[in-house]
C-alpha cells in the first residue's frame, strides 16, 4: 500500500524541499530529553478533533531545503535529538529523510530521532515508497496511529488517544523508561516571545494552562 504525499522541489536545485509549518529549537514535550522540533505542513489523514488542524492543508507554508533545516538543528547546542511532527512527516518522507541523514552524518546515531505519524506502523512497513521504508530505519521512537477524539486520554505519554501506540524501533531508548518519562516530559509546553504564545503538547489548543497564560497577557491579572 502506497502513501500519498506531496513533493516540493526547488526551481534552482534538484533538492527536495520541506513544507514546514513551524519549528522550535528546544522542547521537552515532544519526546525524550531536550529536542528540536519541526512541524511539517500537510496531512491527508485529517483526523477529526486534531489540535494541529491548521497543519492539514498541503498548501505551501515555508518551503525550506533539508540542508537548511539540518544546519539549523546542528547549530543548536545541548539537544539530544530531533522530533518531526505535523502535519504528516511521512507524506514528505524524502525531505525528512534527507534532513535526518545530513544530521546523522555530523552527529552519528547518538543524535536521536522521534517522529509522530497518523499512520499505523504496519501501513508504513507495507509502503512501496523506498523513502518511507528507509526513513523508518533512522527512527528511534515512532508515535503512530490516527488521533481518535472519542479515545482521547490526557494521561498518555506522547500520544493523544488510546488507540495510538509508541514503537521503539532501535535499542537507543528502553521502553522501560516510560514511567520516568511520564514525570520528566510535560504534557503542555508554552514558550513566550515578545509577540507570540507558542503552545505544544497533548491536552488541546484551549487547555487550562494556555487559557491562564492568555488571561495574564491580555488583562495583566495574576492567577
Locate predicted features.
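Charged phosphate-binding loop/patch that engages nucleotide di/tri-phosphates or the phosphate backbone
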Residues: 185-223
Amino acid at each position: 500500500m502506497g502513501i500519498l504525499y506531496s513533493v516540493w522541489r526547488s526551481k534552482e536545485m534538484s533538492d527536495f524541499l520541506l513544507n514546514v509549518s513551524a519549528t522550535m529549537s528546544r522542547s521537552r514535550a515532544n519526546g525524550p530529553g531536550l529536542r528540536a522540533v519541526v512541524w511539517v505542513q500537510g496531512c491527508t489523514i485529517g483526523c477529526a478533533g486534531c489540535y494541529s488542524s491548521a497543519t492539514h492543508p498541503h498548501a505551501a507554508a515555508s518551503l525550506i531545503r533539508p540542508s537548511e533545516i539540518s544546519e539549523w538543528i546542528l547549530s543548536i547546542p545541548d539537544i539530544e535529538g530531533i522530533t518531526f511532527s505535523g502535519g504528516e512527516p511521512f507524506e514528505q518522507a524524502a525531505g525528512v529523510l534527507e534532513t535526518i541523514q545530513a544530521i546523522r552524518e555530523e552527529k552519528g546515531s547518538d543524535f536521536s530521532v522521534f517522529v509522530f505519524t497518523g499512520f499505523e506502523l504496519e501501513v508504513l512497513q507495507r509502503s512501496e515508497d523506498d523513502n518511507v521504508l528507509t526513513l523508518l530505519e533512522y527512527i528511534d521512537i515512532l508515535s503512530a496511529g490516527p488521533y481518535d477524539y472519542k479515545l482521547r486520554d490526557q494521561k498518555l505519554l506522547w500520544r493523544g488517544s488510546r488507540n495510538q501506540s509508541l514503537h521503539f524501533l532501535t535499542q537507543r531508548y528502553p521502553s522501560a523508561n516510560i514511567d520516568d518519562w511520564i514525570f520528566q516530559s510535560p504534557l503542555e509546553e508554552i514558550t513566550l516571545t515578545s509577540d507570540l504564545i507558542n503552545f505544544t503538547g497533548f491536552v488541546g489548543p484551549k487547555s487550562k494552562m494556555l487559557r491562564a497564560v492568555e488571561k495574564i497577557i491580555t488583562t495583566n491579572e495574576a492567577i
